[in-house]
């Protein structure tokens, strides 16, 4: 059974709802891995735009259902996008960025 990563988001931003997300850690690692890959060709990009690009990229490939589940934890699409980005930014600090997407598929 895959390990899970529990991340709680609390913010004063009125556009982001406080939430707790528990999802397979390999989903977050895949997004982070993709973010790092994108940053190779776009070194000037901000971390938010990198993660956003990664989520978009992954959601149109084999990770679609996993990313969809990640986002479905939140109440409204408008707030979900912001909250997911914050969760992923926080995840950067707690999950090792060593795995590649290829190796994660075997989980």
Swiss-Prot record:
It is a multi-pass membrane protein. It is found in: Membrane. GO terms for cellular component: membrane. Keywords: Membrane, Transmembrane, Transmembrane helix. It comes from the Eukaryota. The keyword Transmembrane applies. Disulfide bonds: none annotated. The keyword Membrane applies. The chain crosses the membrane at residues 16-36, 47-67, 85-105. Overlaps CCC2. This is Putative uncharacterized protein YDR269C. It comes from Saccharomyces cerevisiae (strain ATCC 204508 / S288c) (Baker's yeast). The lineage of its organism: Eukaryota, Fungi, Dikarya, Ascomycota, Saccharomycotina.
């Amino acid at each position: 059974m895959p390990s899970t990563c529990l991340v709680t988001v609390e913010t004063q931003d009125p556009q982001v709802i406080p939430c707790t997300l528990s999802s397979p850690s390999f989903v977050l690692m895949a997004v982070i891995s993709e973010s790092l890959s994108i940053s190779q060709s776009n070194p000037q990009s901000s971390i938010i735009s990198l993660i956003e690009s990664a989520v978009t990229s992954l959601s149109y490939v084999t990770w679609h259902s996993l990313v969809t589940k990640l986002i479905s934890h939140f109440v409204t699409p408008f707030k979900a996008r912001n909250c997911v980005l914050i969760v992923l930014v926080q995840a950067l600090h707690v999950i090792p960025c060593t795995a590649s997407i290829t190796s994660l598929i075997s989980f």
